[in-house]
Amino acid sequence: MDRIKKLLNTKKIAMITCYDATFASFLEKNQCDVILVGDSLGMTIKGHKNTHDVSMDEIIYHTKCVRRGAQKKPIISDMPIHSYQSKKEALKNAKSILNAGADMVKIEGDEDVYEIITHLVKNHIRVCGHIGYTPQKIKHFKKNKLEFLAKAKSLEVCGISMLVLSKTGAEVDRLITENINIPTISFRSSGECNGEVEILYDLLGLSNNLKSAYDRTIRKDSMTLKNPINNFIKKIKR
């Protein structure tokens, strides 16, 4: 748990998703603070349109891969959809994820998961919350800053160690970050949180769904990745 204590005291947290040992080793050697084994692997690895086909076995498999590559780096792993529908099931699955090498699990939701999170924390499982856009539920949300603040405070009372704010906007991010005592992590939202999380394959420009201005900046920065591949192909084709 020393890894997590150090992470929680980091002023600006850089979190990046990862699913394999090679990239995990690369991230550990560079300045990434924490690796997220995200259920985004449903899209990036499996080629599905969403996260709904990711299983517990797959999260465990990829968590083990990442831990082999990054033995000293804090790892947070998503609890996939349908893996925390009861307290008993959630605790069993969370323990399996931690046994695979994770230091913390991430759970999407608010009122619907308060009891689950409280139960996990009481059983010494560290939990990262996730509100705003929640891919497992794929539902639209109202950007009411006071409602978001109330949800964040309730999750803090439940015992979460950190909180991901997904596409909630700068005003909401700032309000929550200033009014809770745990680190906040922004996803595609603002620079107003204690840190940011990004999908590795998007950073590398490998995703096919990079459409926003932010995404286009990522793609521009990643153009150099094509050079070694293109050079190899050109050498063979001479």
Identify the function of each model-found stretch.
Residues 1-238:
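Alpha/beta enzyme core
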